[in-house]
Structure formats: structure tokens, C-alpha cells
């Protein structure tokens, strides 16, 4: 419910009487509560196995969860939910989606029982003007979300919802759409983009999967350029990644793992600080580089 709708709603209430209990009113106004501005994250989520391993990347996810104050909710834009149109999950209890194959049975047994937040989903729907946002009751939490958030909030005490990636639209479109989510930072919502900056599965060196900081030359070159643009605030170069040459073409053969980075960067305010963590490559053609945007 947006502010205009809320005011109209109040006008319909009896001036006296008990048509609405106080806790019900609080529930409706809760999305309007303002807090100190939350950080924004882009997380290089890597292999689903990170959900059950305890490696340096997992330790990085855990540490960033400890460094920032606990949010009222998490909104995640995951590489693994592409749709025709834009949707936000709006169920009370999102299911844990095991959207992968060929991994140990232990991984398929993992459940992340975080609640959803239908009220937040409705607020997002009503406040985004760039496109119509649908409320989705079928998806849940895919591994781009739960495999990293479970390390940040292992007790699953923070509600989590997802916003889908509309595969029909351009990087510029996604960047502009993300800007419409800015107000959520002041309402206690932690916004996370989850993907990988360099992500070319076809060129993975399967013999060196466990060798951290191993990358092909083209992957290193693309990664260094990306980091330069990120830290300098030159977002337009990142939006126009398809014009950046062969290294970027190899690093981003398909856009779904890259677009969540643009969502995070679009949410950066002028006076915010920005830093990198988990800044290493794996398997030759993947990077785990993650981004943290914070108030100064």
C-alpha cells in the first residue's frame, strides 16, 4: 500500500469504534517506518556447494552479515530467476528451491525456512512506476538467494523476498528500474544482487575447481576493468558492457549473472562508500568478487 492509498484507506475508517485493532494498524504502517539507510550488497554466489562448505568465500558472507545491522527484510535480485515481465515473491512461506543438478545428496536436504513478506511485496508493486510488477506465489527462494543468505542469517529470522529479472529488457532498463527501489534502504530493507561478475561455465577448468585465485588472462582483464569502473563510479561503462571488447564478451556470455551487479550499483547514493570483498577467481572463468555499499 503506497502513501496515497493509505490516506484514502484511513479516510474510510470510522472516527470512533473498534473497526481496526491497533496491531493491525501497525502492520499496515510498518512498511512506512523509516530507519537509518541500509547498505546494499552484490554477492558473487558461485557454486551451490558454498551453501554447505566453510571456505573463505562463505566466511566473507558470514562476516558481512555480522558487520551490518540486522535488516527488517531482505530483497534479493538473483541470477537464477529470469521471467517474462517483472515479478516479486509474495508468499508467507517461500519454499527452498534446489535449482541445480549433479550435486551431493546433502545439498538437496538443505532447507532455508525464512518467512516471506507479502506486505513488502505489495509495497514494491505499488511504488514501481517503470513497469507492472506481478505478485508471484509459486517461486520461492532459489540458490542464488538462500545459499548466501543462510550464512548471513543462519537462524532464518529475517524475512526474504525476491525480485525477478525480466530477460526481455536491456541493462540500462534494469539499472533504471533498480533506482526505484532506493526508498527501501531507509525502511530497513537490505537489497542484495546475487550473481557473478565473470561467469562463463562453458570455459570452466574442471580440473582446477578448488584452486582459488586461478583465472584465465581474459577473465583477469575483464575483472580488473569491472572493478576499476565500480570503484570510480563509472556505471555507464558497466551498463554498456557489450561495447567493452572481447574480454567482456567472454566474461559475460549471457547477462543473468551480471545484471544483479547493476541493481546494486544503481542503488548507490552520491555520498555512499563502496568496497570489495571475496575478490578472487575460481576455475579459470568465474569470479567471486562481491561489493558492499555503505553510508559514510
Predicted regions and their residues:
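N-terminal secretory signal peptides and thylakoid transit peptides that target proteins
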Residues: 1-14, 27
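Hydrophobic h-region of N-terminal signal peptides that target proteins for export
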Residues: 14-20
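A short aromatic-anchored loop/beta-hairpin motif
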Residues: 21, 25-132
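Beta-strand elements within well-structured catalytic alpha/beta cores of enzymes
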Residues: 39-44, 73-78, 163, 184-197, ...
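Long, well-ordered alpha-helical scaffolding segments within enzyme catalytic domains
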Residues: 57-67, 172-187
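Flexible, glycine/proline-enriched loop segments at strand-loop-helix junctions
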Residues: 107-115, 137, 164-171, 248
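Internal, conserved structured core segments that host functional sites
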Residues: 121-175, 180
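Surface-exposed, charge/polar-rich loops and edge strands
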Residues: 126, 130, 158-159, 169, ...
Amino acid at each position: 500500500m503506497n502513501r496515497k492509498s493509505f490516506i484514502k484507506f484511513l479516510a474510510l475508517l470510522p472516527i470512533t469504534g473498534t473497526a481496526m485493532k491497533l496491531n493491525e494498524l501497525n502492520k499496515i504502517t510498518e512498511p512506512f517506518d523509516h530507519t537509518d539507510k541500509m547498505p546494499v550488497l552484490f554477492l558473487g554466489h558461485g557454486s551451490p556447494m558454498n551453501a554447505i562448505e566453510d571456505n573463505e568465500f562463505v566466511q566473507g558472507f558470514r562476516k558481512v552479515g555480522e558487520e551490518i545491522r540486522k535488516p527488517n527484510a531482505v530483497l534479493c535480485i538473483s541470477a537464477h530467476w529470469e521471467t517474462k515481465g517483472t515479478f516479486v515473491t509474495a508468499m508467507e512461506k517461500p519454499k527452498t528451491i534446489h535449482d541445480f543438478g549433479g550435486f551431493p545428496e546433502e545439498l538437496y536436504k538443505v532447507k532455508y525456512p525464512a518467512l516471506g513478506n507479502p506486505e513488502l511485496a505489495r509495497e514494491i508493486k505499488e511504488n514501481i512506476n517503470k513497469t507492472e510488477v506481478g505478485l508471484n506465489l509459486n517461486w520461492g527462494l532459489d540458490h542464488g538467494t538462500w545459499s548466501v543468505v543462510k550464512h548471513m542469517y543462519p537462524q532464518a529470522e529475517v524475512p526474504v523476498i525476491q525480485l525477478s529479472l525480466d530477460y526481455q529488457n536491456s541493462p540500462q532498463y534494469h539499472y533504471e528500474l533498480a533506482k526505484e527501489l532506493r526508498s527501501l534502504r531507509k525502511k530497513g530493507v537490505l537489497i542484495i544482487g546475487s550473481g557473478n561478475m565473470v561467469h562463463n561455465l562453458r570455459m570452466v577448468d574442471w580440473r582446477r575447481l578448488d584452486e582459488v585465485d586461478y583465472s584465465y588472462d581474459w577473465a583477469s582483464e575483464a575483472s580488473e576493468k569491472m572493478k576499476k569502473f565500480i570503484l570510480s563510479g563509472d556505471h555507464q561503462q558497466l551498463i554498456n558492457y557489450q561495447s567493452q571488447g572481447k574480454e567482456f564478451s567472454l566474461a559475460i556470455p549471457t547477462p543473468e549473472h551480471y545484471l544483479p551487479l547493476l541493481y546494486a550499483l544503481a542503488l548507490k547514493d552520491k555520498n555512499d562508500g563502496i568496497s570489495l570483498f571475496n575478490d578472487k577467481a575460481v576455475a579459470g572463468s568465474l569470479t567471486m568478487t562481491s561489493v558492499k555499499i555503505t553510508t559514510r
